[in-house]
Amino acid sequence: MQLNKLCNIEDWDRDARAATMRRILPYLPKAHTEFPKGMEHRKHWEFAQILDGLDQLNALPSDGLVLGVAAGHEEVLYDLTNRVRWVFATDIYGIGAFAGYEAAHTMLQDPDSFARCPHNRNRLVVQYMDALDLRHEDETFDAVYSLSSIEHFGAEAGAMTALDEQRRVVKQGGIVAFTTEVIVNDAPSLDVPDLTLFRSEQLADMCQRLPGLELVEPIDFSMSDRTLANVTTMEQAQADAQRSYVAYPQIVMELQGRQFTSVAIFLRRTA
C-alpha cells in the first residue's frame, strides 16, 4: 500500500481500508450499514491511513510506546491502546481554537467519556502539552503521529519546529507520521490565522529539510479526476455542520480559491 499520498476516493474501494474504518468508527456502521460506502470523508481516511501505515511499517510492537501530538480525543488514540503498551495523548487541552470540541479540558480528567471504539483504558496517558515543546526525553517513542495539526502551529516555521520535536522524541529507526492540508490546484499557499494550506512543492521541500528524518517513500501527489469531481467550499461545510449535515464525498475542500485535501506522510528517523 502506498503510504505517502493524497487522499483519493479510490482508496475506499479497498476492502482492507473499509475494514479499518469500520473498526475505529464502530458507531457509524451501526447507523449506516454500508459505511464507509457513500460516506467518503477525508478525516476517516486520515485515521485509517495513519493506522494502516504504522502497522505496515512495523511501528506498533506489542511492548511499544506511541505519542499522539495535538491528539485531542480522536479514535486513533483509543484504537492504538489495543496494539501497544502505552499510548500518550498530548494537546493543549482546554485552551486554543479547538478547546470547545476536539481538545476539551475534561479529556484530562475523564478520557473514558470520549471513547467511541473498543480500547484498553489502562494503556492511555493524557497530558497537557504544547506540540512545539514536547516534554519527553529524546528517543522515547517507537512512533509519533499527528493528524491535521501542523497546519495550525504557525505557518511553515511552526510546522517545522513541531516536526523536529517529533523527530527528537522518536527512537532511532522509529516513525514520524502526519497528515496535513495540501493544495491540489494551481493556487499559491495560504496563511490565515490558525491555518496554513501548503503547496505540494513546499511540503516536499520541508520533508527534505527535516534533519534526521527521511521519507519512507516518495510522496505521490496525484489526484484522480473522480476525486476532483466533487469540491466542497469551507463556507458550505461550515453551514452544513450547523444543521448536522455532511455532503459526501467530502474529500476536496475549497477556501479562498485554494482547492485542498489531506495528505499522509511517513518519515523514519535515521539520525
Map each language-model feature to its residues.
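Class I SAM-dependent methyltransferase SAM/SAH-binding core
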Residues: L67-G68, E74-D133
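A short acidic, Gly/Pro-enriched loop at the edge of an enzyme's catalytic core
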Residues: M129-V144
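Short catalytic micro-motifs in class I SAM-dependent methyltransferases
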Residues: Y145-H152, E181
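A short, conserved alpha-helix within the catalytic core of class I
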Residues: F153-E165
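A C-terminal cap/extension of S-adenosyl-L-methionine-dependent methyltransferases
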Residues: S222-A271
